[in-house]
């Protein structure tokens, strides 16, 4: 699957900028560099990992740009191939011109993620580290980048390696019983094997349980502000954003469509959605706003049900509560500066916070409540040793391995032939191997690397 042809792509985002970078990788990268780049000071051979200033010309000898160039000879490069970078003046035209020169000379335009794919295929990184690269690029908060860096440093791969080694040790003992049937596995040995598998299952469960927190850090949290009209929903959105994004008036029904904004609160990337007030109405425009608000409930990770704390809950409050009854709900009892009434029995069992958005009171408590609800592993920011799952693929593979280990324990309990146990252990070993890329099918690899941008 490894292709040694020379690939080229822009390594910087399109558009104007101070610097544009063109990257090459492959056996012909250095030859192509020397064909079109002339260092200002003559040298017989460019040293690896040194920047050289000079001129870049096309095939006719016309100067394209004054550039800085560097060659990183294998294996001390990102791909473990010869890698060349041209640092030119920023701007799409210059970057495209340099790429066109290399393409005309025999290089090939890189596919999305192909540089990282080559790093994986050449053994520089495993699949979890490759996935961490794109997570790091796309991270929207410090917590998310810390988790991605931990994975890029190999923390997840190390943990998966431990799991794989324990499974391999169990398999070796079971296969010994198959190869030497005259030496039956004694009861004590069976109990030891079962206990080892049980301990491994418990360790896997602890890692699996981190997925929801990791998913939120990686993908962000979709938070819906919901409730009847004039309870302070738009004021709450403006308070969280720190700016007057939504129109606020004393007239019920001012918000008639959804308003969405991205922000980071307490290390959490959020997509905040303000909605029309929920009530029965004859106004067709407002009615459409209510319908859209209801439709957003199903896709929300969290519904902030806003209640006017200075009034008793009414029919419209109960209607809004019913619409989000089966979702993750955090009740925001607003306007507590006006009055503090007892909590309605309709809210029994639901978590709540008290706020006065206009007085800017209670917002920190709201953010903390959201964080505690969804990120149980927030300490990863301070401790890179913590392993947190961020990919559904990783969770699915660990669940599959865990299930195989459970069936292996059952073969011991039932006194079944060791061949049955060996099958389950091999399945478990294959499952954990999928995470790091040891046993990953090509179609999964393709899906992973096509998520990358060209040039990475």
Swiss-Prot record:
Record-level GO cellular component terms: cytosol
Textual note on the cofactor: Binds 1 potassium ion per subunit.
Enzyme class: hydrolase
Functional description taken from the UniProt entry: Exhibits a very high intrinsic GTPase hydrolysis rate. Involved in the addition of a carboxymethylaminomethyl (cmnm) group at the wobble position (U34) of certain tRNAs, forming tRNA-cmnm(5)s(2)U34.
Signal peptide: none
Superkingdom field: Bacteria
Name of the protein this chain belongs to: tRNA modification GTPase MnmE
Organism, as annotated: Syntrophotalea carbinolica (strain DSM 2380 / NBRC 103641 / GraBd1)
Chain ranges of the TrmE-type G domain: 220-375
Lineage start: Bacteria, Pseudomonadati, Thermodesulfobacteriota, Desulfuromonadia, Desulfuromonadales
Keyword Magnesium: yes
Cofactor(s), by name: K(+)
């Amino acid at each position: 699957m490894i292709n040694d042809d020379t690939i080229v792509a822009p390594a910087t985002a399109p558009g104007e900028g101070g610097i544009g970078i063109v990257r090459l990788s492959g056996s012909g990268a250095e030859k192509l560099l020397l064909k079109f780049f002339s260092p200002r000071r003559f040298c017989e051979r460019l040293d690896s990992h040194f920047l050289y200033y000079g001129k870049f010309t096309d095939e006719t000898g016309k100067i394209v740009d004054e550039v800085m160039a560097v060659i990183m000879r294998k294996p001390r490069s990102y791909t473990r191939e010869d890698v060349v970078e041209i640092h030119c003046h920023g701007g799409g035209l210059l970057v495209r011109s340099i790429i066109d020169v290399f393409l005309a000379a025999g290089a090939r335009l890189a596919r999305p993620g192909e540089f990282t794919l080559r790093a994986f295929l050449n053994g520089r990184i495993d699949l979890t580290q490759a996935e961490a690269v794109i997570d790091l690029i796309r991270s929207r908060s410090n917590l998310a980048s810390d988790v991605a860096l931990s994975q890029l440093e190999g923390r997840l791969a190390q943990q998966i390696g431990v799991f794989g080694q324990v499974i391999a040790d169990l398999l070796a003992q079971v296969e010994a019983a198959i190869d030497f049937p005259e030496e039956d596995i004694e009861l004590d040995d069976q109990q030891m094997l079962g206990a080892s598998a049980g301990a491994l299952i418990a360790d896997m469960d602890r890692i699996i349980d981190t997925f929801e927190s990791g998913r939120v850090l990686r993908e962000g949290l979709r938070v819906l502000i919901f409730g009847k009209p004039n309870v302070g929903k738009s004021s709450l959105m403006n308070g969280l954003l720190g700016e007057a994004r939504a129109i606020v008036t004393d007239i019920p029904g001012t918000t008639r469509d959804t308003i969405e904004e991205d922000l980071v609160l307490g290390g959490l990337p959020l997509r905040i959605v303000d909605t029309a007030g929920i009530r029965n109405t004859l106004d067709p425009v407002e009615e459409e706003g209510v319908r859209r608000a209801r439709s957003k409930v199903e896709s929300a990770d969290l519904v902030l049900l806003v209640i006017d704390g200075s009034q008793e809950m009414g029919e419209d409050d109960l209607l809004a509560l019913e619409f989000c009854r089966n979702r993750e709900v955090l009740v925001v009892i607003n306007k507590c500066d006006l009055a503090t009434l007892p909590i309605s029995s309709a809210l029994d069992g639901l978590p709540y916070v008290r706020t006065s958005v206009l007085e800017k009171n209670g917002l920190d408590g709201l953010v903390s409540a959201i964080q505690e609800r969804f990120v149980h592993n927030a300490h990863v920011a301070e401790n890179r040793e913590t392993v947190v799952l961020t990919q559904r693929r990783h969770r699915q593979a660990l669940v599959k391995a865990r299930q195989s280990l459970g069936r292996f324990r059952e073969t011991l309990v039932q006194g079944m032939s060791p061949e049955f146990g060996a099958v389950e252990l091999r399945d478990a070993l294959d499952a954990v191997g999928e995470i790091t890329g040891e046993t990953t099918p090509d179609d999964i690899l393709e899906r992973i690397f096509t998520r990358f941008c060209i040039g990475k």
